[in-house]
Amino acid sequence: MAKRRALGLLLCLLLLLCTACGGQTQDDAGALHCTVKITCSTVLEHMDDLKPGKADIVPADGVLLPETTVAFSEGDTVFDVLQRVCRAQGIHMESTWTPAYNSAYIEGIGNLYEFDCGELSGWMYSVNGVWPDYGCSGYTLRDGDTVVWSYTCDLGRDVGARQGEP
């Protein structure tokens, strides 16, 4: 009888622990979610154009952050989520505010900066496969969005961006 009672108590404790340690945290409860990926794979095809000393920071597969699910709040922008995910993952990110565009401009991610791979290189973002023609601070995310930050070596042509085209 004592063994049965101990087993029952153990099962109750296990159930309590599983409930307390579920998939969502207090901070995550009721949050919206998107996925974020950061890639610089185009650099792999342009290593000769890369500034000296930068080759060591480019991952072998060109992926700085694999597709990662991120919780966000109503009203958060692509920039807000980029800041949060980079901080959480220990990825260096540098930006500056650009008044002309009323948005943050991403200068560098993972120590890979604009112009590190030629005059037409820098960071661009897409959401759900679309390349917005405005800054990342101006794009308010929706639940389920997929954000990809891509390093371009050719003003977006090498990553599939069709900026300025109908």
Predicted regions and their residues:
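Ubiquitin-like/PB1-type beta-grasp interaction modules and other compact soluble beta-rich domains
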Residues: A2-G8, C12, L16-P166
